[in-house]
Amino acid sequence: YAQSGLLAEVHPSADFKAKLSDIGWEATKYNGKQIAYPIAVESLSLIYNKDLVPEAPKTWEEIEKLDKDLKAKGKNAIMWNLAEPYFTWPIISSQGAYAFKVTANGYDAKDIGVNNEAAQKGLQFVVDLVKKKVINADTDYSVAEASFNKGETAMTINGPWAWANIEKSGINYGVAVLPTL
């Protein structure tokens, strides 16, 4: 629509722009022009069962150690939806991968950073977690959600849309930033 000239530039006031995140405003620009208002910004996070993990781990090394301890009790440290790249993207991009290169004029859709060395390093980290049996390669959303909500898994990577089901399940949970690599 923007390329065809079907969208008009919008001019929000400075006061209004200050109420929303810069990343939301940047995501709604085209060729340096503000063509939309950001309506939602969500983020994935580490959701953890406080009864199994009193404090969220800060590193993946902690998660690997925790997984060994929990597996001895018939539980898992972490599961998340590996069927959809969205849920693994924070790990892949943590090494410098990007969907589109950010330029002074916004995003360059011709410069895709999902097959660069940084993306490969991030993805290799996930592959290594599978090889170490910390995670299962065939885990999808429903498997990860059910396991966490039954108290069988200590942590999951998910977003705010998952909180209602977690609350219905009675899990005593916390939300934290994802661990560093």
Residue ranges and their predicted role:
Residues Y1-L44, E55-E64, A72:
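Hinge/lid segment of periplasmic solute-binding proteins
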Residues Q3-A8, N31-K33, S94-Q95, I166-T180:
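Ligand-binding "clamshell"
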Residues G5, Y48, K58, E62-K65, ...:
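Extracytoplasmic/secreted proteins, especially bacterial periplasmic and envelope-associated proteins
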Residues H11-L20, L70, Y98-K121, K168, ...:
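Short, solvent-exposed loop/beta-turn-alpha elements that line the ligand-binding surface or hinge
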Residues K33-I39, L44, E64-D111, T153:
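Extracytoplasmic/periplasmic solute-binding protein
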Residues D51-T59, Y98, K132:
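Short helix-loop capping/hinge motifs at secondary-structure junctions, enriched
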Residues L66-D67, D108-D138:
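Glycine-centered hinge/linker elements that transmit conformational signals in sensory
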Residues Q124-L181:
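Extracytoplasmic/periplasmic substrate-binding proteins
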